[in-house]
């Protein structure tokens, strides 16, 4: 069991969460303040059924402004963004979007799960998070779709646009993507608990 002290609680972090989430609309991300810890989110979470992930714990830490408890936690990266919690919350807390905002904050601090870095690298390389292979093409054709989706697979010139956006937003720097070698740079995690 981890015990947190008063020094771990920060109103500045609460403000940072709200400021980072402003792009989603006024009051959207600050909806985490309305959570009364009923547990509906945790009970409906598919990740929580097979891991120790507890959605409401992240929201509680956000309410208390416990930055290191959130960004140093693997739990932050266990959410599949399925929106079950979001849809079922009786207080209309925008949980999934809040988790995305918390991930953005963690990534800016150099705290991103390795699997998410690899996915980001794949997006940089191909324009997609999920590869298109012969099995996917066959399945698409069987259900009446074109074998190749109308994305960067079909329009390869658009891939340079995607890469340009990622570079302009400094996403590659944040994730640690070497744009010349198309590999992840080795990055040391900063220990925020000290």
UniProtKB/Swiss-Prot annotation:
Q: Tell me the superkingdom of the source.
A: Archaea
Give the matching Pfam families: Fer4_9
| Positions contributing to [4Fe-4S] cluster 2 binding | 45, 79, 82, 85
Q: Name one GO cellular component term.
A: plasma membrane
Query: What is one Gene Ontology biological process annotated in the Swiss-Prot or TrEMBL record?
Result: electron transport chain
Q: Cross-referenced InterPro entries, in alphabetical order?
A: 4Fe4S_Fe-S-bd, 4Fe4S_Fe_S_CS, CoB/CoM_hetero-S_Rdtase_csu, HdrC_iron-sulfur_subunit, Helical_ferredxn
* EC number from the UniProt entry: 1.8.98.-
Signal peptide feature range: none
Tell me the PROSITE patterns matching this sequence. 4FE4S_FER_1, 4FE4S_FER_2
GO MF terms held by the record: 4 iron, 4 sulfur cluster binding; CoB--CoM heterodisulfide reductase activity; glycerol-3-phosphate dehydrogenase (quinone) activity; metal ion binding
What keyword terms does UniProt attach to this protein?
4Fe-4S, Iron, Iron-sulfur, Metal-binding, Methanogenesis, Oxidoreductase, Repeat
Q: Where does [4Fe-4S] cluster 1 bind?
A: 35, 38, 41, 89
Q: Which cofactor does it need?
A: [4Fe-4S] cluster
Q: Where are the transmembrane segments?
A: none
Pathway membership, UniProt = Cofactor metabolism; coenzyme M-coenzyme B heterodisulfide reduction; coenzyme B and coenzyme M from coenzyme M-coenzyme B heterodisulfide: step 1/1
Q: State the free-text cofactor note.
A: Binds 2 [4Fe-4S] clusters per subunit.
The 4Fe-4S ferredoxin-type domain is annotated at: 25-55, 67-98
Q: What does this protein do?
A: Part of a complex that catalyzes the reversible reduction of CoM-S-S-CoB to the thiol-coenzymes H-S-CoM (coenzyme M) and H-S-CoB (coenzyme B).
Quaternary structure annotation from Swiss-Prot or TrEMBL: The heterodisulfide reductase is composed of three subunits; HdrA, HdrB and HdrC.
| Similarity comment | Belongs to the HdrC family.
**Name of the protein this chain belongs to:** CoB--CoM heterodisulfide reductase iron-sulfur subunit C 1
Q: Which organism is it from?
A: Methanocaldococcus jannaschii (strain ATCC 43067 / DSM 2661 / JAL-1 / JCM 10045 / NBRC 100440) (Methanococcus jannaschii)
Lineage of producing organism: Archaea, Methanobacteriati, Methanobacteriota, Methanomada group, Methanococci
Gene for this protein? hdrC1
